Amino acid sequence: MGKITSIEVQKRNVNRVNVYVDEAFTFACDAELIYKQGIQKDSIIDIEAIKEIVKEDEFIKCKNSALRTVEKTYKTEKELRDKLAEKGFEEDTIKRAIEFLKEYNLLNDEKYAEMYIKDRLRSQGRNKIKYALIRKGVSEDILLDKLSNIDTEDENDTAFKLAEKKYNILKKKESDKYKLSQKLFRFLLSKGYDYDCCNSIVRRLTNNEYME
């Protein structure tokens, strides 16, 4: 047990206060939290109450950090979890912050996958998109659902346009038709298009039988 002898607003951050128990600095926390907890000068406080306040303050800091992160750029749950862990927040605190954001639909892997696919389809095939989303922690169920909605004809049209542009650049530098075909094929593969799509487009553009 101890007596709160002083509550001082921090000079560098007016939203936080320093709390002194029995004349000694004991902890710092969010000013609003102090108000909500009904803590004031001359209040009696024990060590368990202090631990709970510090724990709740850590959650507030974690939540605010999470909010700032998703305000800058939308994240998957894994990306945000990793970001918060890098900042030193404990797993239980991170879990609470993530649940808070999910409750207000500020963190939604399904929505993220939809937006990511829509954006990347302008320049990438489904394979590259798929593996990028896997690295970002999107679940297999979400991936299967969202990738199945991709229009194959539209994807192939995009692949052809990208290949045509690349082909016009390559043919100015490469006179060997076999090498040209191989370079174009590898380019399309690197963009995430499947073998059959790449093979068909290369044959169509180069009008030859150099593809194996």
From Swiss-Prot:
Domain of life of the native organism: Bacteria
GO biological process, one term: regulation of DNA repair
Segments passing through the bilayer: none
GO cellular component: cytoplasm
Pfam families to which the protein is assigned, alphabetical: RecX_HTH1 (PF21982), RecX_HTH2 (PF02631), RecX_HTH3 (PF21981)
Cellular location(s): Cytoplasm
Main localisation: cytoplasm
Keywords: Cytoplasm
Function: Modulates RecA activity.
NCBIfam families: PRK00117.4-1
Protein name as annotated: Regulatory protein RecX
